[in-house]
Amino acid sequence: MKNQNQHNTSKCPYHGSVTSYNSNRTTNKDWWPNQLNLSILHQHDRKTNPHDEEFNYAEEFQKLDYWALKEDLRKLMTESQDWWPADYGHYGPLFIRMAWHSAGTYRIGDGRGGGSTGTQRFAPLNSWPDNANLDKARRLLWPIKKKYGNKISWADLMILAGNVAIESMGGKTIGFGGGREDVWHPEEDIYWGAEKEWLASERYSGDRELENPLAAVQMGLIYVNPEGPDGKPDPVAAARDIRETFRRMGMNDEETVALIAGGHTFGKAHGAGPASHVGPEPEAAPIEAQGLGWISSYGKGKGRDTITSGIEGAWTPTPTQWDNSYFRLLFEYEWKLTKSPAGAYQWEAVNLREEDLAPDAEDPNVKVPPMMMTTDLALRFDPEYEKIARRFYENPEEFADAFARAWFKLTHRDMGPKTRYLGPEVPKEDFIWQDPIPTVDYELSDAEIEEIKAKILNSGLTVSELVKTAWASASTFRNSDKRGGANGARIRLAPQKDWEVNEPERLAKVLSVYEDIQRELPKKVSIADLIVLGGSAAVEKAARDAGFDVKVPFIPGRGDATQEQTDVESFSVLEPFADGFRNYQKKEYSVGPEELLIDKAQLLGLTAPEMTVLVGGLRVLGANYRDLPHGVFTDRIGVLTNDFFVNLVDMNYEWVPTEGGIYEIRDRQTGEVRWTATRVDLIFGANSILRSYAEFYAQDDNREKFVRDFINAWVKVMNADRFDIHLKQAKESVTV
């Protein structure tokens, strides 16, 4: 039998499917590279998930022997394995880097990235140059994952291992919240950059303006280039990159200094020899490597011979102990530029004292000089960073506390509100970056809900105003980092009340009516609940006017946040620059309106059919920004009909482009202009997949189905941030 790797193997006559990207089959993308990508709306469905459908991770986590798990992790830290020995006999620094790099891909611009789904296990993250040799860290964790199984996700385990690592070396932490649920394949919705080569940097324009929503400076890096911008060893220029990158992760200067200094208090960088000795990353490794990458032929290929970043050495003389020696060395010595054995820029101390030599990674009796990266020296030579770093140097307890808080924020920022946290170590303290919301202490009976709906419908507010306000409040939700949503009613507060898309004057009028209703009620009901209930009442009325007597499921329990609980700068990133559901776009972008609609739908957690039915329903309900007529293909505005779809696919009309990206819908016989539309509207007739959904909802026998599906999708958005209730309860079936 011939070796399967030989090039002269016979061609299989029965292999008709496309099973690799290297297939010689031509795909739709090859023919039509600009084709709309709807696949990001259908990720992580049941077909990829090996768990039973009834599996509930939160319930499994509650069965976990949490303290036994932490003890097993603590023991692992010093149980060095021959196949990948621990530097200094302690795996702590490796696990800190693993946890940091899991959480550190998060960016505030779109809330994507981060450690909440365990995607460091998959491409591209598992093969990023900045994640080199973290595959070894995950393999070291496997016996513990195997032991505790479904009770602890990979996502939670990686972060918890980082916490235990810090604690095992004398560092301070302030707690841990579980609840990160694994996905089972890569997140294809995340834009990591346009570069086609690792460590390429094509994401800047103008005066080093970083492309949105990216945070990292180069393809395949978590943060910044440790050698300096584009590999140039300039600490001051590096500080500029650091500040912008960490800002885009939601970190201020103090948190940035604490994280860099705290992380570099531990461990070492690895650059024992030239990178030419290092094999391919995990995704490119041969099958016999079994998912391990970066296998090195330099020396033993491990221990003191390891090659990772190319920079070589520890930062401190005590690399497995929490102390203040990082700042002491940073400020007490002058630093001279040099190169590592791998040829990377780094800095060495001038006139180093013997007591400040670091131990060798394998033999504590052998001493080697410590080093600093260009990005470390940025903390000394940038004026603002220097003030903070020197204060931490002079106040070690303040530094320890600042690091613990910044670490908790780093590892939990993408988890959403505190109500999602699980486990016995959840801190009691609320942090403003968690977007805290007061809990409510009232319940509403069905009769009370009906009375309130009647008050709202008799208040003088229109169906359009009620629907618009509810949508504006709820559609801020981002499933990426679980921020936004109707809970908290932050639409009353800065900055949301002043966003252009929310039509501030009209919004103020609607909120004033809700406040009047709230005062008149015999019991306290939150504005957040009233806004959602008002939208639901309007949808019910619109459905009744269309001939369908329906109840829109409503679950009270939302609280009203205060301005003091709302970080204006942090919430500003949630402002929509486009919302196709309201036919709104702030200005022209390089990306088409239809693509921005799909991105918005993905952030809301919607499927393609849900996106379709919501757009069609919101158009006829009059939810467009400033009542623009585009896409309102009906003569019965405010009535929940399928008219949008009926008229969209009607061949009696033709679609003619005009100026400003607007299209006219004309009668083919008379030339009469019936309606106008945007690309967002027309894509549901132009894209073959979306047209199939549009035709489905345009069918005569699917009018009722359209109403039911619209309500289910509407309720899904209204309850997207209700982590205190079960999703299946929120999506109870609609009876018509």
UniProtKB/Swiss-Prot annotation:
Subunit (UniProt): Homodimer or homotetramer.
Cofactor note: Binds 1 heme b (iron(II)-protoporphyrin IX) group per dimer.
Cofactor(s) the record lists: heme b
Alphabetized PROSITE patterns for the sequence: PEROXIDASE_1, PEROXIDASE_2, PEROXIDASE_4
Crosslink (Tryptophyl-tyrosyl-methioninium (Trp-Tyr) (with M-249)) position: 100-223
Species the sequence originates in: Geobacillus kaustophilus (strain HTA426)
Purpose: Bifunctional enzyme with both catalase and broad-spectrum peroxidase activity.
Gene Ontology CC annotations of this record: cytosol
Keywords of this entry: Heme, Hydrogen peroxide, Iron, Metal-binding, Oxidoreductase, Peroxidase
Cross-link Tryptophyl-tyrosyl-methioninium (Tyr-Met) (with W-100), sequence positions: 223-249
Chain coiled-coil ranges: none
Enzyme Commission designation: 1.11.1.21
Binding annotation for heme b: 264
GO molecular function term, any single one: catalase activity
Pfam family, one: peroxidase
Record carries keyword Oxidoreductase: yes
Protein name: Catalase-peroxidase
InterPro entries xref list: Catalase_peroxidase, Haem_peroxidase, Haem_peroxidase_sf, Peroxidases_AS, Peroxidases_heam-ligand_BS
Transition state stabilizer (site feature) positions: 97
Catalytic EC class: oxidoreductase
Catalytic reaction list: H2O2 + AH2 = A + 2 H2O; 2 H2O2 = O2 + 2 H2O
Family assignment from sequence similarity: Belongs to the peroxidase family. Peroxidase/catalase subfamily.
